[in-house]
Amino acid sequence: MAFSLCWKAPRSQWSFLQALNSGFPLFPWRTVGSCLDLKMKAYLEENTEVTSSGSLTPEIQLRLLTPRCKFWWERADLWPYSDPYWAIYWPGGQALSRYLLDNPDVVRGKSVLDLGSGCGATAIAAKMSGASNILANDVDPIAGMAITLNCKLNGLNPFPILTKNILNTRQGKFDLIVLGDMFYDEDLADSLHLWLQNCFWAYGTRVLIGDPGRPQFSGHSIQHQLYQLAEYTLPEPTQQDNNGLTTSAVWDFHP
């Protein structure tokens, strides 16, 4: 994503724009919303572009914010919904999705929780690779609508989507938890670490993490419990969109 944009405006006006420059900051947890709002659906379809290029997963079509979209250039305060983090295909999610598509045995026949699902690409990759049950989780109800639209783009029936903060709750058993680009804030990283450890110890849940090497991740104590499974060179457009980050990796969590 280029940042010589009119839409960028003063960065103080929209934390989303800071996200793109700093690598995805903390955003507020939100309450459950409807994924069936027709007005919202029409607005997202009008203001996003269907694309499968410029990422590690050309097999997956997604509705994203691109330079051909009005709000790439428009004033940020004119966007009527919560900050559209879901409208960017972040590099950690790209690596996770690529890994699942290339290694379908990891998810085939398994139950999967996609934590911080965003555009839903990793959940979609899991479904394409044969996962039996999927729950996509994101704190933003607008992401829920985006995930629903992206499922349909890829010929999939929408899977369950939970739009709330689940880090303070005890979740049911999943065979696999996947999360990408979630270690962007130190406090959140600590909460994630504890929550993921509890899932592993309580249920033996496998955890895969995608990250391009942000400082909050590479400098966190969780590194002592990770094993790298794969590393991918990011496509040039993704490198440009992420301040020159060149690779993204997938890690297996073993506390």
From Swiss-Prot:
Identify the domain of life: Eukaryota
Q: Does the keyword Cytoplasm apply?
A: yes
Q: Which InterPro entries match?
A: Ribosomal_L11_MeTrfase_PrmA, SAM-dependent_MTases_sf
Keywords attached to this Swiss-Prot or TrEMBL record, sorted alphabetically, are: Cytoplasm, Methyltransferase, Mitochondrion, Transferase, Transit peptide
Chief subcellular location equals: cytoplasm
Residue spans crossing the bilayer: none
- Tell me what reaction this enzyme catalyses: L-lysyl-[protein] + 3 S-adenosyl-L-methionine = N(6),N(6),N(6)-trimethyl-L-lysyl-[protein] + 3 S-adenosyl-L-homocysteine + 3 H(+)
Question: Transit peptide from where to where?
Answer: 1-32
EC number of this enzyme? 2.1.1.-
Presence of keyword Transit peptide: yes
One Pfam annotation reads: PrmA
User: What are the subcellular locations of this protein?
Assistant: Cytoplasm; Mitochondrion matrix
Q: Which GO terms describe its cellular component?
A: cytoplasm; mitochondrial matrix; protein-containing complex
Provide the assembly information.
Interacts with HSPD1; this protein may possibly be a methylation substrate.
Under PANTHER family, the record lists: ELECTRON TRANSFER FLAVOPROTEIN BETA SUBUNIT LYSINE METHYLTRANSFERASE (PTHR43648:SF1)
Q: What does this protein do?
A: Protein-lysine methyltransferase that selectively trimethylates the flavoprotein ETFB in mitochondria. Thereby, may negatively regulate the function of ETFB in electron transfer from Acyl-CoA dehydrogenases to the main respiratory chain.
Report what the protein is called: Electron transfer flavoprotein beta subunit lysine methyltransferase
Organism of provenance: Rattus norvegicus (Rat)
